[in-house]
């Protein structure tokens, strides 16, 4: 595709008030982020508009529905409202195009994928793990690793969401069933530095706070930073790159 063999992209879901801490941490290590923000979230507090605007100056903002609701539980009319209205409201707040969308809870149907595209989003980000191959992204953008220590059962279940087997083989054989996110990140990066690829790190600031993962995350970001052979992109920049619309 071009000489860049390793890409780092990150994304952060739910628009929680501690996303500002995430943004500052990313900026400390010159790493780009895409923040997927719902208009409202009845589970936890969403950041105020002034903070959202502040974060948007250096990072990408993406849509995450109006009410942070699982789209596959809604009828077509309600799902279309959640998708389209979140885009409109964010664009009104920020005065810029919103191109990226993330499915709350990673829940979606083929209908929802179509609605996301019809609303004018370039893609919908999922929660599927262990994707590291640099290849065109059309409708769905999968991820590499979540900042969370999942059980092996959960990690395998996420792998099984895929319609192809490479993430399952990667987890069982290359990553040897490890469940610690820091150890998994080290193994993924070892593989990337050898073979090239993309590392898409994602998570929730509320979860990082709840489980005390800030130090581990900072250590990881520090290790990811300042490599001349790595391209640091937000999610939409990555989409443009793999679809041959961005030259680095």
Name each model feature, range by range.
Residues 1-3, 28-33, 43, 91, ...:
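C-terminal domain-boundary segment and adjacent tail
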Residues 8, 98-99, 228:
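Short active-site oxyanion
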């Amino acid at each position: 595709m071009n000489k860049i063999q390793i890409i780092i992209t990150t994304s952060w879901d739910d628009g929680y008030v501690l996303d500002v801490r995430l943004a500052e941490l990313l900026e400390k290590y010159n790493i780009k982020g895409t923040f997927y923000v719902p208009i409202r979230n009845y589970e936890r507090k969403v950041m105020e508009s002034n903070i959202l605007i502040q974060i948007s100056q250096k990072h990408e903002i993406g849509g995450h529905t109006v009410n942070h609701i699982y789209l596959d539980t809604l009828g077509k009319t309600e799902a279309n409202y959640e998708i389209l209205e979140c885009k409109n409201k964010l664009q009104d707040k920020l005065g810029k195009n919103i191109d990226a969308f993330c499915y709350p809870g990673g829940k979606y149907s083929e209908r929802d994928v179509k609605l996301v595209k019809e609303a004018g989003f370039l893609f919908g980000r999922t929660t599927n793990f262990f994707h590291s191959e640099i290849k065109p992204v059309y409708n769905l953008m999968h991820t590499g690793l979540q900042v969370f220590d999942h059980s092996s059962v959960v990690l395998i279940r996420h792998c099984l969401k895929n319609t192809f087997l490479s993430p399952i083989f990667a987890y069982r054989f290359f990553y040897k069933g490890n469940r610690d996110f820091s150890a998994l990140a080290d193994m993924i990066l070892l593989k990337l530095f050898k073979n090239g690829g993309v590392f898409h790190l994602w998570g929730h600031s509320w979860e990082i706070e709840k489980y005390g993962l800030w130090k581990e995350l900072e250590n990881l970001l520090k290790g990811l930073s300042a490599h001349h052979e790595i391209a640091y992109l937000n999610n939409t920049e990555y989409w443009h790159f793999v679809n041959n619309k961005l030259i680095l």
